[in-house]
Amino acid sequence: MKMIRAVVRPSKAEEVVDALAESGCVALTKMDVIGRGKQKGIKIDQIYYDELPKTMLMLVVEDDAAENVIELITKTAYTGSFGDGKIFVSPVDEAYTVRTRSCGL
């Protein structure tokens, strides 16, 4: 299994969530976060924003689905401008459902 953490623009988050749901990935966690990338913030007129609001989507998928999910997120969140986001992928050894105490997705 893979954990996918996608940090995207808040304005694109619902579009990404909807695209994931349409592809069958309905289980995810969505969080509002604040951060910055390589460009270290943004300056608009005389105001400098050190950190910018983003939305983080976290989901766990089977290994064979990870590449398609990453492609879907990348395609849907893309604007072509700085700040489109980042996707992090990590291995997941096990996942447990609290209610049923079952292991796996």
UniProtKB/Swiss-Prot annotation:
Pfam families: P-II
An annotated GO cellular component: cytosol
UniProt-listed SMART domains: P-II
Keyword field contains Methyltransferase: no
Entry coiled-coil feature ranges: none
Keywords for this protein: Nitrogen fixation, Transcription, Transcription regulation
Superkingdom of source: Archaea
InterPro entries in the cross-refs: N-reg_PII, N-reg_PII-like_a/b, N-reg_PII/ATP_PRibTrfase_C, N-reg_PII_CS
GO terms for MF: ATP binding; enzyme regulator activity
One GO-annotated biological process of the protein: nitrogen fixation
Function text: Could be involved in the regulation of nitrogen fixation.
UniProt similarity note: Belongs to the P(II) protein family.
The protein's name in its UniProt record: Nitrogen fixation nifHD region glnB-like protein 1
Origin species: Methanococcus maripaludis (strain DSM 14266 / JCM 13030 / NBRC 101832 / S2 / LL)
UniProt lineage: Archaea, Methanobacteriati, Methanobacteriota, Methanomada group, Methanococci
Gene responsible for this protein: glnBI
